Regions:
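Structured catalytic core of nucleotide-sugar glycosyltransferases
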Residues: 1-84
Length: 84
């Protein structure tokens, strides 16, 4: 299993396209994968953009209520990945 960790903050305009591109890459790949997106207290529509993707992709969204920064968000994603 390959875990792809994606920290994000206010990425409503780009995160959907990124997830779809990753899906395209793995369509022909024989490897199992799981996407982990860390929403670092986005104030835009990032959570709304991510929600429908959880139904069609192997995707987990970890939302933070307070801005933690890139490094802490990535660390949280990595820690979560090792528990799966």
């Amino acid at each position: 299993m390959l875990y792809i960790c994606i920290p994000s903050r206010n990425e409503a305009q780009t995160v959907g396209l990124l997830l779809w591109k990753i899906r395209q890459v793995f369509t022909d790949a024989p490897r199992e994968y799981h996407l982990l997106v860390g929403d670092d207290a986005s104030t835009d529509a990032t959570p709304d953009v991510l929600a429908p993707y959880t139904k069609v992709l192997p995707l987990t969204v970890l939302r933070q209520d307070r801005h933690a920064g890139y490094a802490r968000t990535l660390e949280r994603l990595l820690r979560h990945a090792v528990t799966l």
